[in-house]
Regions:
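Terminal, non-catalytic domain-edge segments
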Residues: 23-27, 31, 35-153
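Active-site cradle of extracellular carbohydrate-active enzymes
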Residues: 1-34
């Protein structure tokens, strides 16, 4: 019930969810309500390995995999040790930490909870002190690419 649906398509999950409404909710001041590939990849792995996969589980799983495939940024990585910069590196897979609930635009937020859309708009201590992007879905999409799209649903 907490998987976020955008324009009729199943995507990924939020970082935190309300236990009653299942809506994405904020955490710390810079952790806005969102969709996040970091926390979602473990859910997808669990669903891919679920023994008695119902049609609902199958749709949830492949909807999320499709989201990862559509939103990967190839040949870039997040260098936290270089003050939190996004840098070119051939062969890398990258997803940003937070995505809007209604579209696939990524964002960041400072401690004042205001969304910003470039990493350079972050406070330097927050920019280098938090994992704003990562390769979280790399193994997932590499493994799932072995299954043709017409066999997924």
């Amino acid at each position: 019930n907490s998987q976020i649906i955008v324009n009729g398509s199943r995507t990924i999950w939020g970082q935190q969810h309300d236990p009653y409404t299942f809506e994405s909710v904020p955490g710390r001041s810079f952790e806005r309500e969102c969709r996040t590939p970091n926390e979602s990849v473990g859910i997808v792995a669990l669903l891919l390995n679920w023994e008695d996969r119902t049609p609902e589980i199958i749709n949830a799983t492949w909807g999320a995999v499709d989201w990862y495939e559509r939103n990967v940024v190839l040949d870039y990585w997040f260098n936290k040790s270089n003050n939190g910069t996004i840098e070119y590196r051939e062969g890398e897979f990258l997803w940003y930490r937070y995505y809007n609930l209604t579209n696939d635009d990524y964002f960041f937020a400072n401690r004042d909870s205001i969304k910003v859309y470039t990493i350079d708009e972050l406070e330097i201590s927050l920019k280098a002190g938090y994992r704003w992007a990562g390769s979280w879905g790399e193994a997932l999409i590499k493994e799932s690419s072995k299954i043709s799209k017409d066999q997924r649903f």
